[in-house]
Amino acid sequence: MSSHKAGVTGVAERYATALYELAEDRGALDQVSADLRSLKAMLDESGDLRRVIASPVIGRDDQRKALTALAEKAGFHEIVRNFLGVVAAKHRSFAVPGMIGAFLERLAARRGEVTARIVSATALTSAQKSALTTALNKATGNTVTIDASVDPALLGGMVVRVGSRMVDSSLSTKLKRLQLAMKGVG
């Protein structure tokens, strides 16, 4: 399983690098990155779309047609439309989420930006995201972009990851620590 994951990561990195270099050469980094963020949002919201790109049962032509139609309807840049067509034709659609992530990470590194991955028990409000962004900008000395997700299993609080650093202030972790402390008392 881990070797498959490493293979997906390698495929995603190679395709993302090619897309990045093409977009940079054509002066379209901003448009391509905006399109990829939109595609990421679509993938996050649509289980059906995730299944279409991940399914080995769906043929290359059908995946290509689906991705091309989606890209055209969304008004994506020609580079992104062609890229998605090539990815589907090469039967690499399963790696699209990784390709998007690798592309955006490379762009962020070029711009001196850092991504903070925040997992919270409930969705963050705009005010909370703004306050977190300000605090993280100050703490890291970099421009921070927030990648927020929700995990109700946290019960409350949040887990913040910036690079290799992590702060876990979730209620579930605090309860686990309390449970361990109580075991030592008896």
UniProtKB/Swiss-Prot annotation:
Keywords: ATP synthesis, Cell inner membrane, Cell membrane, CF(1), Hydrogen ion transport, Ion transport, Membrane, Transport. One of its GO terms (cellular component) is plasma membrane. Pfam families: OSCP. F(1)F(0) ATP synthase produces ATP from ADP in the presence of a proton or sodium gradient. F-type ATPases consist of two structural domains, F(1) containing the extramembraneous catalytic core and F(0) containing the membrane proton channel, linked together by a central stalk and a peripheral stalk. During catalysis, ATP synthesis in the catalytic domain of F(1) is coupled via a rotary mechanism of the central stalk subunits to proton translocation. NCBIfam families: ATP_synt_delta (TIGR01145), PRK05758.3-2 (NF004406). Belongs to the ATPase delta chain family. This is ATP synthase subunit delta. It comes from Rhodospirillum rubrum (strain ATCC 11170 / ATH 1.1.1 / DSM 467 / LMG 4362 / NCIMB 8255 / S1). The gene is atpH.
